Amino acid sequence: MKLDGVGETIAVRKLTLVDQEGPGREVLALLGKPKQLPDHSDYYCPYQIKGAGDEKVSYSSGIDAFQALQLAIGTLGVELEVLNKELRGKLQ
């Protein structure tokens, strides 16, 4: 399933990409409201990192909205950790 955006945003984490040559750039971790999958009883929860990386909208799925949300939070945390390693620890 391809998503154009996270939809209704339920949480935002603001981070800064530190650059020694100038002011830091804002990076946002967005978490969308879980929704039921089309034609299915399971749910998905969209998330996106804006301001660094590829900025694509991703999602995690679960048997209900709670599990989808829980998995999305965990996956988003891992993706931020990987991105920070790629950026050599400049994400704060």
Regions found by a protein language model. Give the residues of each.
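N-terminal intrinsically disordered, cationic/polar leader segments
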Residues: M1-I63, V78, N84-Q92
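A short, charged, amphipathic alpha-helix used as a generic interaction element across diverse proteins
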Residues: L69-G77
